[in-house]
């Protein structure tokens, strides 16, 4: 049920390219039009050439160097301007295929335009919410939402969807509640009017003080394995993180380029689990989908205004928050403009977390999994 807001937006984040991005859309889907018979020529169209070329070009040059191939395949603006229907977004918070930045903050943009929208955001990945066996296989991942099993199983989701269709397509039944059902990585479901929610408290941690460097130097090398690791002091109380955390890092580079990957972990001693990550091609250091202003390498500095992929995580008292900076990670390609990136610690480099008070929230327990072998 995962949906796209655009083709480029699916496979690029702040200019950084997933490994599949340069060739998948046209190299894979486009190949369905070619099967080696004499009728192939009837299926040929310019996009078979333009598409892969644009994909490779977006990685090499950081954007659409010529033409409007990607712009034609961006859908969200037309939905916001023209759509008169309803939207029910069902999204896995750890979907490796359709990342949650397709749905967050899209859900709020829809609501702000008056479009009747609801969200069901659980800790599954690219699976249906009621597939017990597939979700069970995630339960020993060590993070990435696997710890939310079995509470992530939603046997009621298709009934919910049926009632949505009955109301909006047939006028039967009653109007659904237009809220967001969001699950934390520890399994608890709660109701939010919007997501990210508005009633949050920002916690700011400075690199070098609140987050102490515990290993590595200040340089991030373009080898995907060398960079600094920062860690907080043990938390005095439970921390509940939601939405789109930010990492603003002041850096200098050896060339006009480079890339930063940030891994955020919840650590109990040396036992750490993944709770979130962010990535940025530094040519996009101001954030967003447009190339940013240039800078002078070596002597000049820029602030990489990174935004994490949407997350909802609980970090318990006594645990620490660990931040690792590398040149790439997950399934992202190294930057075409690889460079040594030097982290400037201090007030210009901060991790910004949006937290909430669970006692202020409406929580509930969905239908419980009773599968005797798995739950």
Language model: regions and residue ranges:
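Surface-exposed intrinsically disordered loops and tails
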Residues: 22-59, 130-151, 291, 367-375
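Conserved alpha/beta-hydrolase "acid-adjacent" motif
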Residues: 96-104
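C-terminal catalytic histidine-bearing segment of alpha/beta-hydrolase fold enzymes
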Residues: 116-204
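Short secondary-structure boundary/capping segments
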Residues: 12-18, 103-107, 113, 133-149, ...
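Accessory cap/linker subdomain of secreted extracellular hydrolases
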Residues: 1-82, 172-177
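Short beta-strand/loop motif that positions the catalytic acidic residue
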Residues: 83, 89-91, 95
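Loop/turn elements at helix/coil->beta-strand transitions in domains of secreted/extracellular proteins
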Residues: 84-87, 113-118
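Intrinsically disordered, low-complexity Ser/Thr/Gly-rich stretches
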Residues: 206-375
């Amino acid at each position: 049920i995962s949906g796209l807001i655009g083709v480029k937006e699916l496979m690029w984040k702040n200019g950084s390219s997933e490994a599949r991005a340069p060739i998948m859309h046209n190299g894979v889907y486009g190949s369905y039009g070619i099967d080696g018979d004499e009728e192939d020529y009837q299926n040929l169209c310019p996009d078979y050439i333009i598409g892969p070329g644009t994909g490779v070009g977006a990685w090499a040059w950081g954007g659409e160097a010529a033409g409007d191939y990607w712009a034609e395949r961006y859908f969200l603006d037309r939905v916001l301007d023209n759509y008169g229907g309803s939207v029910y977004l069902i999204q896995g918070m750890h979907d490796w295929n359709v990342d949650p930045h397709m749905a967050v903050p899209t859900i709020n943009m829809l609501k702000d335009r008056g479009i009747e929208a609801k969200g069901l955001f659980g800790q599954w990945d690219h699976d249906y919410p009621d597939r017990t066996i597939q979700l069970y296989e995630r339960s020993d991942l060590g993070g990435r939402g696997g710890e939310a099993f079995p509470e992530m199983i939603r046997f009621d989701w298709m009934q919910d969807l049926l009632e949505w269709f009955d109301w909006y397509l047939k006028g039967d039944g009653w109007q659904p509640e237009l809220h967001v059902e969001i699950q934390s990585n520890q399994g608890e479901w709660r109701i939010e009017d919007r997501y990210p929610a508005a009633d949050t408290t920002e916690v700011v941690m400075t690199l070098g003080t609140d987050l102490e460097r515990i290993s590595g130097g200040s340089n991030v090398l373009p080898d995907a394995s060398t960079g600094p690791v920062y860690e907080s002091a043990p938390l005095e109380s439970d921390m509940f993180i939601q939405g789109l955390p930010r990492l603003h890092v002041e850096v200098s580079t050896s060339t006009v380029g480079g890339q930063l990957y940030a891994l955020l972990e919840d650590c109990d001693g040396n036992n750490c689990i993944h709770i979130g990550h962010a990535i940025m091609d530094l040519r996009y250091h101001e954030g967003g989908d447009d190339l940013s202003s240039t800078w002078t390498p070596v002597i000049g500095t820029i602030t990489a205004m990174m935004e994490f992929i949407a997350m909802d995580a609980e970090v318990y008292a006594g645990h620490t928050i660990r931040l690792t900076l590398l040149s790439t990670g997950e399934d992202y390609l190294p930057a075409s403009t690889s460079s040594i990136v030097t982290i400037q610690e201090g007030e210009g480099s901060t991790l910004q977390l949006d937290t909430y008070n669970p006692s202020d929230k409406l929580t509930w327990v969905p239908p419980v999994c009773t599968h005797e072998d798995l739950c």
